[in-house]
Amino acid sequence: MSENYYLRQNVQVEPLVDQWYAWPHLIPPATSARNITHRHFKIMDSYIAAPQIHANAVKNPKMLGGPFIDYGGKRVDEVRELRDRTKRDRANLIELSQAIESLDAMLRTSAKGYSLHPLYEKIPAPLRGYVELVYDLNHHPSFRLMEPLLYRSRYYDPSQQSMMLSTTSSDDRPFVLSTPRLESEDSLHLRLPFNSPVIDDLFRLKSTARPWNEIKDMLSTPDSQDNLLKMFLTPEAPPAYSPYTGPGVRWRYFGHACILIESQGISMLFDPVLSYTYENGISRYTYLDLPETIDYVLVTHDHQDHILFETLLQIRHKVKNIVVPRNNKGTLQDPSLKLLFQNCGFKNVIEIDELDEIQDGQVRITGLPFFGEHADLDIKSKMAWLARIGAHSLLFAADSCNIEPHLYEHLHRDLGDVDALFLGMECDGAPLSWLYGPLLTQKVERAMDESRRLSGSNCEQGMHIVNTFNCREAYVYAMGQEPWLNYIMSVKYTEQSRPITESNRLIETCKQRGIIAERLFGEKEILLEQKPPRAAAAPELISA
């Protein structure tokens, strides 16, 4: 009888789209097309022309997150081959990107407030039948993409998708969003689309062993890669998970914006971003600390540090429901998260609007408006989550920026007090073009770009939320400080960095008022068994 094997807990999984690290804008056809032509090609062309400039830039901490390929100036021929192959194999997406740009230009010159009907004949051929032309109430022209149809068209090709397996033993990992993943001797490249059930079977091996021959057949790997595949397997069983069975609520912080709540047999996981298991000086929860079944995964928004396919694909087999905010249907900058997850093989995707609720026993989850942090773009697929479990209430506001304090006053009048606030305070976010640049069809002025940033709340804005909801606890999170997040985050704080000084002031202000406050880092566990009496909170904003 063949020996049974588990997947090792330190197997690193990189989901790829045409060998680029997969993040939410690389999967919907329209945003994928724009990123290929206006991000990937630009980076590859630059590297081919001047590889040493890239090699020097990646050594400079100030350049972290910039458009530089991290291969030390080497492997230029492989990058050139990838570029040329992409141009050949993704000609449809290149045409789609060009058509989006041409359509935008046509509307700017031809749509002057009169009927748009005659302009349908001028729509570029790749977009005919996939867009509706519209005005807003001020007669500004735009178009609405038929996104469900695009997923069923020649513009969506799951064969673009694959997974690269390797092993990791430390938090030291290069930034991945600007460097394509090339083949290497110690990596196993699995040509699996993200909706493949084989992916679920693969990650079930983390807790359920199978014979070698079944694993090999499942992955369809050639005999020449047997030794490599065996490096990722072990006969040793992982430790069993102990679910929380107490009478109240347990929440655990896994790093960044990832928090697991367990109560009365129901589990909720917010913005899953998990570390692998290996010996390291910083204590953390990992995949080993997840329950066998996760009732609800809740996503706040579609930035790459909140929707991490590297984590989500590994836990998909555990997830009963994934809850996402509803988008502005048909806009380029706001692709549907429901369609995204459905096309990536997730079942039971629940799309909810602001103030919609999910009720499951004594658990109520309410979607709350999320302002800011999206460079003033008209993006609706962002949501804060209010979780009420019996007498307890926790508000996960993610990167919400309190640019309109009256919003929270209206919400408090409707929803009442909240026990604990979780708030991101990256108040010096990247400019508009860093994330959304490929979607823009016109050059943005530098001053305009710098003024529109992906920024969260500062101290004054955060304290207003604490005061408005009479919070007893305030936790700063989603700061990207955990070292195992370096590969997707481009922040390197010092004690003088504004997000640190602003969050320090918020924490100190809260403590002076008897409010429990902390900037979360690494791991934390809190048990909520009996609700303590509420401490009075000052009704007026304490200014920073």
Can you name each region flagged by the protein language model?
Residues Y285-D353:
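Active-site HxH/HxHxD metal-binding segment of metal-dependent hydrolases
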Residues T277, H303-I307, K329-L332, D356-Q359, ...:
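Active-site environment of divalent metal-dependent phosphoester hydrolases
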